[in-house]
């Protein structure tokens, strides 16, 4: 029988390996898993709609979605693939916000940015993936008018929308724009929902709260969490 000391050393070894995995890697892997589960869930119901992503960065989430889109099927149990278009919005130049409330020690500058040409090259074989170079804060014009989705060639409701811009202002603007594409059953993913020290009056949490207050016909059900601070909701329209 092993001594408690030797057992503890084995536990320490395992924990050192596990805790040595960068948190960013774990977060992205859990996000990829969440995206896979959602695509599968939608396909079981044969639920139609496109995938939209705000905040493409280097394209890892979009690649997760692209793979999930073409692999979420099973002949054994009769789950058929639902062919979907995937759209990625990003400035491809860095974080954008015009309010001091979005000041953050990490989410600024161009650290998480890749040129759109590099992203397009990465997805050159994915004909159902489109990237749109756009500052999300301009999806709602100064007069309050919402830019029509048809301007970007989108003529279908959304099945999944990922908000990965971390900050309040662009996320609220993207939510307001997305209202025209929502349907009961649309999944909303927020990648940094508990940021800014957990202050619900900042970041993505504030954006969602304000959007729901202004759109009383839209309700959301809690679907779950992923990664370091990701949150998932399902839309219900009144």
State where each predicted segment sits.
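Conserved alpha-helix/loop element of class I SAM-dependent methyltransferases that forms part
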Residues: 33-47
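S-adenosylmethionine/decaboxylated-SAM
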Residues: 5-26, 45-238
């Amino acid at each position: 029988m092993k001594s408690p000391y030797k057992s503890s050393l084995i536990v320490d070894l395992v924990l050192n390996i596990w805790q040595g995995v960068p948190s960013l890697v774990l977060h992205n892997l859990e996000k990829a898993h969440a995206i896979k589960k959602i695509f599968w869930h939608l396909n079981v119901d044969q639920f139609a709609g496109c995938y939209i992503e705000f905040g493409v960065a280097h394209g890892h989430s979009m690649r997760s979605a692209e793979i999930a889109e073409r692999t979420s099927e099973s002949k054994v149990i009769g789950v058929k693939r639902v062919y979907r278009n995937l759209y990625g919005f990003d400035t491809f130049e860095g974080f954008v916000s015009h309010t001091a409330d979005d000041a953050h020690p990490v989410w600024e500058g161009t650290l998480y940015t890749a040129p759109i040409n590099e992203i397009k090259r990465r997805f050159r074989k994915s004909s159902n993936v489109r990237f749109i170079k756009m500052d999300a804060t301009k999806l709602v014009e100064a007069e309050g008018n919402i830019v029509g989705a048809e301007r970007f060639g989108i003529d279908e409701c959304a099945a999944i929308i990922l908000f990965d811009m971390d900050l309040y202002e662009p996320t609220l603007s993207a939510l307001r724009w997305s209202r025209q594409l929502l349907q009961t059953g649309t999944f909303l993913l927020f990648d940094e929902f508990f940021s800014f020290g957990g202050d619900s009056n900042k970041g993505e949490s504030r954006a969602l709260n304000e959007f729901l207050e202004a759109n009383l016909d839209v309700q959301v059900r809690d679907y779950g969490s992923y990664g370091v601070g990701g949150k998932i909701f399902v839309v219900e329209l009144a």
